[in-house]
Amino acid sequence: MPRRRVIGQRKILPDPKFGSELLAKFVNIVMLDGKKSTAEKIVYGALNVAAEKSGKSHLEIFETALDNIRPQVEVKSRRVGGSTYQVPVEVRPVRRNALGMRWLVDAARKRGEKSMGLRLAQEIVDAADNKGTAVKKREDVHRMAEANKAFAHYRW
């Protein structure tokens, strides 16, 4: 542990189109090789397609999809006397958002549609309807935590 003062998290500017910090963070996660304008085109295009398909507003469908992906608990490995236990721990809000967005992008990249924009749009629509690969990932993590609830007293 460092002995100096704790450094706060950097403030990130809200995205120019919707004024949402969460969406700006999402654009940064989609971005590859520092190509932010390309990432913005992909995300905004995906949100347009998703909004058309669902009939909801852009931000509303994104928020709904993210809510359905964010994990509440996860498991962390903890070594106790020679054996390793998977200990369920609650996920902090900042990490919850980060994991949800990362899982959403990973699931979209593994899909079969033509362009990344379409893949992302379809994954957002699926996540908003509580189905899709990203939601399945969250369910798997929750199932692991539930299965290892007996080791919850090893929390640190």
From Swiss-Prot:
Domain of life: Bacteria
Gene3D superfamilies to which the protein is assigned, alphabetical: Ribosomal protein S7 domain (1.10.455.10)
Entry's transmembrane regions: none
GO cellular component, one term: small ribosomal subunit
A biological-process GO annotation: translation
Molecular functions (GO terms): rRNA binding; structural constituent of ribosome; tRNA binding
A Pfam family the protein falls into: Ribosomal_S7
Signal peptide bounds: none
Keyword entries, A-Z: Ribonucleoprotein, Ribosomal protein, RNA-binding, rRNA-binding, tRNA-binding
Known partners and oligomeric status: Part of the 30S ribosomal subunit. Contacts proteins S9 and S11.
Protein task: One of the primary rRNA binding proteins, it binds directly to 16S rRNA where it nucleates assembly of the head domain of the 30S subunit. Is located at the subunit interface close to the decoding center, probably blocks exit of the E-site tRNA.
Family recorded in the similarity comment: Belongs to the universal ribosomal protein uS7 family.
Protein name per the record: Small ribosomal subunit protein uS7
Species this chain originates from: Pseudoalteromonas translucida (strain TAC 125)
